[in-house]
Each structure stands twice: as C-alpha cells, then as structure tokens.
C-alpha cells in the first residue's frame, strides 16, 4: 500500500512541496486548502504532468479534512504573510488561529502521522501544533534548519568555487535573524571550510545566511521563497517515509539538551520513521553557546507572546 502525504495549504510553498514529493514518488498526495477550486486545480495540473515525468502517485485536491484521513505525514504550510502595519503580535495571533484550526481538524484523522510544520513563526507554531495535536513530541517537528543549512551550503559553494554536493554544514537555533550557523562544523568533502574561505568572508556568508529569507522577499517585492523551502520540506518527508536516519537540523522539542527545556528549537537530530529519533548534542564552545542562548531567548519571547494571547 502506498504512503499518504497530506499538505495543508495550497499556496506557493504547499503546491511546490507537492511537486517535489510527486517527483520523488514518495506516496499519494492530498493538497488541502480552504479556498474552493485552488487545491483541486493545482493538484489536477500536477497530476496531469505524471505521464510526462513518469511519477505513479495520485495527487488530489480538496477542501475537506476527511480526505486527509490516515496520512503518514502531514505538512502544514498554511499561514498569513506579514502585511504592512501589522505588528509581530498580530502576525503571531493570526497564524496561531490558523494553526489551531488546521491541527485540530487534521490530527485526529491521522493519529499515527508525523507532523511537519512550515509556517511562521516556526518554532512557536511547532510548539502550538504539538500542544493542539497531543501527539508525542518526537512526531511533531519544524522545518527551518534544512532550508537555512541549504542556503548556507549554497553560499559556501559559491564562494569556494566547489560543488554544492561536497559542502556539509550545520546550524542551530531559531529560524530567522537569531539562527546560529556553525562554521566549525562545516566542511567541504571533510576538509574544514576555513581551509577554503577567509574568516572575514565566512562571517559575511554567515550573515547572508541569517538574512536569506529576507533577501528573497526584497528581490521579489511581492511574496517570499518557495522552491528551496519546499525542497527542504520534501527532504524531511523522505527521511521519515523511507526511515533514512538522516542527520539534519530541525525544530525539535528539548527536554534539557543544551540546557534548554520546554521549547521547540533548531538542533541536529536523527530523523527517521518515528520522527525525531535522537537529538544530537554537539560540543559547543563558549562563543557558540552564547549565540545559542541568545537565539533561545528570542524564540522564548515569541513563545511567551503566543501563550499570552
């Protein structure tokens, strides 16, 4: 029997995630959105590409949560973008309401699913999804680090003039300006990245990575990134459905790791069929720990705002 993946939110990130997943033939895909016709149209369009691209998976669009029942993975991309004049608190409230609505309807229909959150503010929305679903924390995770690491790896490859395939990089922390790229744990085919790139240039690359999402928003003028976020999400879905035991940074629930408790936070994990199968604790130095704690403080502030609403 084929696996089933439900994607809630048929916007750019949701529909592009469906595209990457179909190309990988990971399972049948259900694309759900509240707007009538949009998920149906996008799903049909994608499904009609299957004879050309040769993927044998069904892609269906719906407005009905009943069609998501018995999913193996649920991906949540639904959320409102920040509009001019909107405070951070306003955005948190709007997206919290959307997340509650999505999870409260989808989770009971797929009690054994792994939930992957892709909406912002990522760490807080993942915390909320875990709370609303009642799922074991290891089966509710956030996609941020895979995308941020991909951007970091891209910039390192561009600077060093090497294949992106040979760049391995790790970063931690919250998604956004407070992320913590870790040059010390970044290599090119096992060779420390510092052998290729001078410290001042590496510092600039770290800063560009932190602002990676904003850079694309500024270039597009309307909208935000979706190819890379969707590809990152598809990679996580693949790790779960194929039980690949991939080592990747995801927003996971911490219970004392890195001195942090009761928080969803970007850390390296082993990702497999059970979701987060192990959280890896890296031997961080004082400077790295200071950056990590500052990042945790920012994530905690967002979480406190969410809890106060």
Swiss-Prot record:
Q: Which Pfam families match?
A: Ldh_1_C, Ldh_1_N
**The protein's Enzyme Commission number:** 1.1.1.37
Instruction: Give the Gene3D superfamilies listed for this entry.
Output: Lactate dehydrogenase/glycoside hydrolase, family 4, C-terminal, NAD(P)-binding Rossmann-like Domain
Which keywords does the record carry? NAD, Oxidoreductase, Tricarboxylic acid cycle
Query: Which residues participate in substrate binding?
Result: 82, 88, 120, 151
Catalytic center residues: 175 (proton acceptor)
Residues the entry annotates as binding NAD(+): 9-14, 33, 95, 118-120
Keyword Oxidoreductase among UniProt keywords: yes
**What enzyme category does the UniProt record give?**
oxidoreductase
Q: Domain of life, per the record?
A: Bacteria
Q: Which GO terms describe its biological process?
A: lactate metabolic process; tricarboxylic acid cycle
Q: Which reaction does it catalyse?
A: (S)-malate + NAD(+) = oxaloacetate + NADH + H(+)
Q: Answer whether the UniProt record assigns the keyword GTP-binding to this protein.
A: no
| Disulfide bond entries | none
Hey, which family's this protein in?
Answer: Belongs to the LDH/MDH superfamily. MDH type 3 family.
The UniProt entry, under NCBIfam families, shows: MalateDH_bact, PRK06223.1
Q: Which HAMAP family match?
A: Malate_dehydrog_3
What's this protein's name? Malate dehydrogenase
Species annotation: Chloroflexus aurantiacus (strain ATCC 29364 / DSM 637 / Y-400-fl)
Taxonomy of origin reads:
Bacteria, Bacillati, Chloroflexota, Chloroflexia, Chloroflexales
